[in-house]
Amino acid sequence: MTASYEDYDTAIKAFWAGRDLQAQKQSESGKTDAGTRGSVTGGLHLSALQELIAREFLPLADLGATVRQSGIIPLPGYYRRAKNWDVVVTYNDILVAAIECKSQVGSFANNFNNRTEEAIGNAVDLWRAYEAGLLGKTRPWLGFVFVVEHAPGSTTIVRDQGKPLYSPDPVFDNSSYTRRYQILFDRLVRERLYDAACLISSAKGEGIYDEPLPEVSTRNLTAAITGRVAYIQGLA
């Protein structure tokens, strides 16, 4: 199955509905997290997106591949024992794909660096594990899908606090958090930390508002997955 723009748009709408449902359940239980955490700590808000991505690998199931996108799916690390990934596809001893799905809604100043460090660190750890012989002989394929809320906090120019001891890359000057995510994922893919990435901007409660960078769009992600599926089919 090849996912369309409309499929992703529907999955993003389900993302917002899932957040609202989880926040409601927490409120009814009387156990409410601070800020918007109650919308995400249930763990299901990105399930529609994960299921859509997993379905794109289903042609490999006919070959005996296993497609996982629910529950706990740990892969070995190098600097830590293991890390759970959102979508994992395996065929014999080949790690066909490992894909992470993340989002940021509000709290942009507080969480941007955390999201950046996660994206970089997870990839570095997995590639080092592969180099150490922990993930088979065939090169794995890594993907990252990120949903950022389209809101004033993500689209206005960041007023950075403090002056760095050395001059930062000027590409970050006068940029919003959404623009900084564009730079992050573009560089992660260009430098092969990830084989494909997708950055989606969405206003609260709606579908896709924008895909700010064509190189990290739903179309490019789908094309990259199609290429990976064809490669594994060729090996089989």
Predicted regions and their residues:
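A short, flexible beta-alpha/helix-coil linker loop
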Residues: 103-107
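Interdomain/boundary linker segments immediately adjacent to catalytic/signaling cores
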Residues: 1-69, 75
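Hydrophobic, Leu/Ile/Phe/Ala-enriched alpha-helical segments that form helix-helix packing faces
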Residues: 49-61, 123-130, 180-192, 225-233
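Charged, often glycine-rich, active-site loop that binds/positions anionic groups
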Residues: 71-87
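Acidic, metal/cofactor-coordinating or nucleic-acid-engaging core segments within structured domains
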Residues: 109-210, 214-215, 219
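Active-site beta-strand-loop-beta-strand hairpin of nuclease catalytic cores
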Residues: 88-98
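Low-complexity intrinsically disordered segments
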Residues: 54, 58, 203-236
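Phosphate/oxyanion-binding active-site loops and adjacent basic polyanion-contact surfaces
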Residues: 42-50, 80, 111, 115-118
